[in-house]
């Protein structure tokens, strides 16, 4: 996907209250932008970082600008979690993810299970179904290695339990890590941050949930998933 109109490059002053970021333009003007990422944004919110914002002309919006990209340790990183479903859908459509190819039908945000949850993407072929949960990944902890989650995620563990239930009911299920950065080759569960999530992820993989990861090419003009990444479920240490 490409950003249209072009993004605006500014300097990050601070990110706060999860949804807000103060920035400064090259000519010294300061204002507040919307931050579309509720995670900890570990390693992606250092004051002084170069960031890129999109602009909306909608007069009803409280904040006209939305934070899209940040330069972190020399890599451009897409921090907008709202783009991840679209990116994975595009990757499925292009055939990048072989494990999810060949499904003629696709629906978004479909209710499923007995708790009223919504699945990010539902692939269908007649009575056959594949439930696809998407997780946006931004945190990298060492050269080429990204982790998820970057904060304790009870919701993430719940989603894994629901995917396992779908497999037990005879359906297919997959979790796709959408890594919006180009300097990663492997994704690992963040056991040091959320050990329960790591446990549930391994249980899900053993139960038949496909655990997949794709890496993006990120540039100021857009983001596209273009590589399949390794997923390492071995226990650290």
UniProtKB/Swiss-Prot annotation:
What Gene3D superfamilies has UniProt attached to this entry? 2.40.50.580, 3.40.1350.60
Give the InterPro entries listed for this entry.
SfsA, SfsA_C, SfsA_N
- A molecular-function term among this protein's GO annotations: DNA binding
A Pfam match: SfsA
Q: What PANTHER family does the entry give?
A: SUGAR FERMENTATION STIMULATION PROTEIN A
| Protein family according to the UniProt entry | Belongs to the SfsA family.
HAMAP family the UniProt entry points to = SfsA
What is the recorded name of this protein?
Sugar fermentation stimulation protein homolog
Q: Which organism is it from?
A: Thioalkalivibrio sulfidiphilus (strain HL-EbGR7)
């Amino acid at each position: 996907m490409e950003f249209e109109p072009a993004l605006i490059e500014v300097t990050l002053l601070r990110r706060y209250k999860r949804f807000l970021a103060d920035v400064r333009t090259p000519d010294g003007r300061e204002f507040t932008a919307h931050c579309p990422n509720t995670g900890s944004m570990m390693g992606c919110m250092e004051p002084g970082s170069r960031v890129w914002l999109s602009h909306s002309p909608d007069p009803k919006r409280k904040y006209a600008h939305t934070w899209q990209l940040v330069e972190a340790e020399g890599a451009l990183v897409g921090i907008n979690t709202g783009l991840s479903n679209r990116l994975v859908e595009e990757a499925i459509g292009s055939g990048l993810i072989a494990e999810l190819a060949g499904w003629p039908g696709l629906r978004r945000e479909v209710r499923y299970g007995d708790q009223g949850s919504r699945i990010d993407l539902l692939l269908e072929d007649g009575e056959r179904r594949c439930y696809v949960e998407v997780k946006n990944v931004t945190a990298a902890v060492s050269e080429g290695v990204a982790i998820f989650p970057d904060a304790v995620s009870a919701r993430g563990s719940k989603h894994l339990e629901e995917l396992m239930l779908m497999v037990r009911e005879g359906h297919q299920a997959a979790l796709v890590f959408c890594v919006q950065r180009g300097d990663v080759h492997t994704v690992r569960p963040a056991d040091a941050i959320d050990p329960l999530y790591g446990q549930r992820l391994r249980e899900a993989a053993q139960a038949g949930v496909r655990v997949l990861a794709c890496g993006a090419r990120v540039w100021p003009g857009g983001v596209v998933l273009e590589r399949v990444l390794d997923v390492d479920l071995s226990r650290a240490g």
